[in-house]
Structure formats: structure tokens, C-alpha cells
């Protein structure tokens, strides 16, 4: 929401990807009211479904035939229960990393088109300091092991299996960005791959974690 708001204030044409919901609709109306002179377009996308992400990729191509200047992979969930998605991956890993990876692949040609036309395009992935709680990426978290990755464990902040899974997703964000940056640099591409840690912010991320039992010891 805040990222979209900032881009709209700069006069950008913004596509906002989200699952259909009352909360999203209310946020969309606020953005439209505050930025009546700019264009904001909703695109249905559920990151817990690869099929939904692919549909969103096709929609973005329809809306941006001349290219995409910036892709901001900003969505995330934190310390949720050990459950699988419909694609059998861990719900955190698919939401936070795998679907972002897929979306990037699906719209990469649009980013290349914009970079060639305008001299630059950017891919921005949001990571977290939580990546430092894990020493290395473990393949099991990237495979179809949803529901079999340590259970729910402790609700202590940055403790237990659910927080380990979250840390793996955030390390995956950073590793993906570093690898992509390296490959783009070798090609002398005008696409920049960047990773950011947004710091602590007032969002609904923590409230969702609390409802799911992931931060009980803090409240």
C-alpha cells in the first residue's frame, strides 16, 4: 500500500496485485481518492497459487504491452503454521519467494523491453533481517514439502520451526536477487536487481502472524 502510494505521488501508472478481498478494495479506493490524477489498476493475484500468478502474468502483458519499468515483489506472510499450498509447497516459501520468482520470470520480457526503450528497469525484492537467523538455504524448504517442515513449534519471536521457515524465505529473497544481479551484470543488462530490508513498519504482517499463533509470547 505504502509503496503504491509513493509511486502514485510521483505520477507513475501503478498495477497493484492482490487477492480479491474487502480490505484490498478499501485500500484501492483510498489510493484512487488520494491520487485522482494518476492511474492505478488492480490485478487479481493469489501468491499461494501458481495458477493465479500465471494468470496475473498474462494480465500484466495485456496492460503493459510497451514494457514494465519496475517490478516490486513486496508481498509476504510471516511465521505461519506448517501447512502446504495447493501446489504442495510451504505456504511461507511459496508466498514470499517462489511466486515472486515465477512472476519475475513471467514479466521479464516486459522489463527488458522497458530497459531497452528507457535505459533502465528495476526488480526490487523485499527481504528481512530475519534471513540472518538461518545459516544457509536448505533445499527441503524449496521443495514440495509443505506441512512436513518442522511443525508449528514455539511462538517466541525468531524462535522455533515456523520462524526458521520464515528466515529461509527471506534468505531466498536475498540469494535470488544476488544471483539475478550477477547474471544481469554478465549480460551488461540495463535491468537492475535490488534487495531491500524495509525495517520495522506498521503493517498487517504482524497481526496475521499473531492470529496464526506465531507471536503469542509477545502479547
Residue ranges and their predicted role:
Residues 1-210:
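Rossmann-fold NAD(P)H-dependent dehydrogenase/reductase core
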Amino acid at each position: 500500500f505504502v509503496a503504491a502510494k509513493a509511486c502514485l505521488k510521483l505520477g507513475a501508472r501503478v498495477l497493484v496485485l492482490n487477492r480479491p478481498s474487502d480490505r484490498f478494495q478499501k485500500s484501492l479506493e483510498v489510493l484512487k481518492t488520494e491520487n485522482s490524477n494518476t492511474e492505478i489498476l488492480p490485478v487479481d493475484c493469489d501468491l499461494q497459487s501458481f495458477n493465479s500468478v500465471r494468470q496475473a502474468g498474462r494480465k500484466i502483458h495485456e496492460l503493459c504491452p510497451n514494457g514494465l519499468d519496475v517490478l516490486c515483489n513486496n508481498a509476504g506472510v510471516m511465521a505461519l503454521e506448517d501447512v502446504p499450498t495447493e501446489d504442495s509447497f510451504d505456504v511461507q516459501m511459496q508466498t514470499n519467494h517462489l511466486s515472486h520468482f515465477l512472476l519475475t520470470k513471467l514479466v521479464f520480457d516486459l522489463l527488458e523491453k522497458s530497459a531497452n526503450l528507457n535505459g533502465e528497469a528495476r526488480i526490487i525484492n523485499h527481504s528481512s533481517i530475519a534471513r540472518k537467523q538461518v545459516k544457509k538455504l536448505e533445499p527441503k524448504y524449496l521443495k514440495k514439502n509443505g506441512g512436513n517442515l518442522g511443525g508449528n513449534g514455539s511462538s517466541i519471536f525468531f524462535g522455533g520451526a515456523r520462524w526458521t521457515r520464515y528466515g529461509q524465505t527471506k534468505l531466498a529473497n536475498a540469494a535470488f536477487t544476488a544471483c539475478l544481479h550477477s547474471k544481469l551484470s554478465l549480460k551488461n543488462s540495463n535491468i537492475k536487481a535490488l534487495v531491500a530490508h524495509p525495517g520495522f513498519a506498521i503493517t498487517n504482517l504482524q497481526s496475521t502472524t499473531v492470529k496464526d499463533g506465531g507471536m503469542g509470547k509477545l502479547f
